[in-house]
Amino acid sequence: MIILSTNDNLTNPYEIARYIKEAKKSTPVRAYIQGNIEIEETEELEVYGCDNFKIVFGELDVVEKLIEANEDKIKHYRLEYDRRNSAIPLLDIKHLDARIEPGAIIRDKVKIGKNAVIMMGAVINIGAEIGENSMIDMNAVIGARGIIGKNVHVGAGAVIAGVLEPPSSVPVVLEDNVLVGANAVILEGVRVGHGAVVAAGSVVTEDVPPNTVVAGVPAKIVKIVDDKTREKTKLMEDLRG
């Protein structure tokens, strides 16, 4: 099994793809077992419960063999699982200094900055970075190695393209204080400059200069960010921290 360490080159999409291909695939399950059965805890099985009821954690193939071997002793059982042949585990979020809402999916090797907010249904892929005080709104997608700066808002349903499929050596970068409207799409390799605003529903195919507003399909510069725009797009600090 190949483990992608902190020293591995996440800038190379082919290295990430190799890791995914060669990583040991996992189908972890949780089994609730009722019956007169003795289950010994091993390196492959984690067991809780009492004489006639057990909760067992392990890989699907191991747990299924256990159930088949003790079929005559089991009255009822139920299996719960949420993935199949998964190559990348989810990020351990329990000690992050950020707000992570239920239903967010954040894969391993992601960096989440202080006071960031990840809303329900957001998906953040391997190698992405979310800066301090930034919000990834509901159902937004941050692709592999997407770089999100500080004080950024990525609107609901927006898509920040990743470096995988099609492979790209250059990640999408949103610099500090950028606002991306709902359902906008930022394509591979695009850099959105400091303080820029991407209007809702736009498709951004080329770099966006700092402090500009872009809109449309494909997105074009429509104005320079002014005081009125800053007022309409300012972040709410009470939602952070």
Swiss-Prot record:
Catalytic activity: (S)-2,3,4,5-tetrahydrodipicolinate + acetyl-CoA + H2O = L-2-acetamido-6-oxoheptanedioate + CoA
GO MF term list: tetrahydrodipicolinate N-acetyltransferase activity
Pfam families membership: DapH_N, Hexapep, Hexapep_2
The keyword Zinc appears for this protein: no
Keywords, ordered alphabetically: Acyltransferase, Amino-acid biosynthesis, Diaminopimelate biosynthesis, Lysine biosynthesis, Repeat, Transferase
Keyword Cytoplasm recorded: no
Pathway, per record: Amino-acid biosynthesis; L-lysine biosynthesis via DAP pathway; LL-2,6-diaminopimelate from (S)-tetrahydrodipicolinate (acetylase route): step 1/3
Any one biological process term the GO annotation gives: lysine biosynthetic process via diaminopimelate
UniProt cross-references to HAMAP family, sorted A to Z: DapH
Purpose of the protein: Catalyzes the transfer of an acetyl group from acetyl-CoA to tetrahydrodipicolinate.
Family: Belongs to the transferase hexapeptide repeat family. DapH subfamily.
Protein's name in the database: 2,3,4,5-tetrahydropyridine-2,6-dicarboxylate N-acetyltransferase
UniProt source species: Thermoanaerobacter sp. (strain X514)
Source lineage: Bacteria, Bacillati, Bacillota, Clostridia, Thermoanaerobacterales
Gene (UniProt): dapH
